[in-house]
């Protein structure tokens, strides 16, 4: 693990101590956050407003290496050895950075492992969900996972069951659109298909916004010193499909959709796009994927006042294999 991590060593920013906590919301800093999602390894790269030249950055360690102690491997000193900012005592969630996976009781369509069929949690779709119940459970999860009410680090809400833009629920998320149209058909049996789709879109997006906005607001109210945001936004969907049709830039349609959810970015303290890489992409295509997604995140950040920071999630294991990124990131 340390050999893999050495690929990403960098000179720490002169304005911060390696043992310091997460940055304030108003201080521009370059950072790399090393983190994990389930059993995978993550890195978070906080880009300074200038994308052309990054002179220094900090590394934040948020990997559950406390589990390695039983095997004789001890990681609690990586902050001293590699100038890494690390949660005290090498905890996964701690004073510097904490991530919440699917917290609360968001409406969702979940799969039963035994039958592979979907069942509804809290109504299945946001327009059928109980917001009060969700927020009550979210607050309970927040108290359990981040008990320190003075937590002043980075707080990430990782909710990926559906996206607040109705159209973007495609592929494996198509059931959310199907259920939304079905609900409208039951409410309006004589409406045309186009009318049903428009009403499904309107209600899904209005209530989806309410769930995401109120969750973020509650997190900020209960842990006001932390810097909060949602993982993976803004979406871009670049470098997908056949090689001949892949594009570095987010499509104009996606950019317009991201403009429609400025409420999400205005309500966040930090913007957390994802630039996970696929091994099947060529090195130049991987560069294009990163550039396009970071460019879109910075574009969105430039529309916020005050301008939000951008922390980019980069997993240093490919998403389509178990191979580590090596040469392509040197």
Model segments located where?
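N-terminal module-boundary/linker segments of secreted carbohydrate-active enzymes
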Residues: 48-93, 120-128
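N-terminal signal peptide
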Residues: 27, 32-35, 39-60
């Amino acid at each position: 693990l340390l050999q893999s991590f050495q690929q990403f060593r960098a000179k720490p920013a002169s304005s911060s101590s390696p043992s310091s906590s997460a940055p304030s919301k108003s201080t521009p800093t370059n950072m790399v956050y090393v983190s994990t999602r389930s059993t995978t390894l993550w890195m978070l790269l906080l880009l300074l407003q200038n994308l052309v030249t990054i002179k220094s950055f900090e590394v934040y360690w948020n990997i559950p290496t406390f589990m390695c102690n039983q095997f004789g491997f001890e990681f609690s000193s990586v902050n001293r050895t590699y100038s890494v900012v690390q949660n005290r005592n090498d905890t996964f969630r701690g004073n510097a950075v904490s991530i919440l996976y699917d917290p609360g009781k968001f409406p969702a369509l979940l799969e039963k492992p035994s039958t592979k069929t979907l069942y509804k949690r809290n109504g299945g779709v946001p327009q059928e969900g109980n917001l009060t119940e969700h927020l009550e459970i979210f607050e309970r999860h927040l108290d359990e996972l981040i008990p320190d009410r003075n937590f002043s680090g980075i707080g990430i809400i990782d909710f990926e069951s559906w996206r607040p833009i109705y159209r973007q629920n495609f592929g494996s998320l198509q059931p959310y659109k199907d259920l939304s149209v079905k609900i409208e058909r039951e409410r309006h049996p004589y409406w045309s298909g186009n009318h049903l789709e428009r009403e499904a879109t309107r209600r899904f997006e209005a209530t989806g916004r309410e769930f995401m906005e109120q969750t973020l607001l509650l997190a900020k109210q209960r842990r006001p010193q932390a810097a909060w945001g949602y993982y993976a936004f803004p979406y871009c969907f670049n470098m997908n499909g056949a090689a001949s049709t892949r594009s570095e830039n987010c499509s104009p349609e996606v950019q317009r959709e991201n403009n429609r959810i400025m409420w999400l970015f205005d309500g966040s303290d930090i913007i957390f796009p994802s630039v996970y890489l696929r091994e099947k992409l060529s090195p130049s295509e991987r560069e294009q994927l990163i550039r396009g997604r970071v460019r879109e995140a910075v574009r969105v950040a430039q529309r916020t006042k005050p301008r939000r920071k951008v922390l980019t999630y980069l997993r240093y294991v490919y998403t389509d294999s178990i191979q580590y990124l090596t040469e392509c990131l040197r």
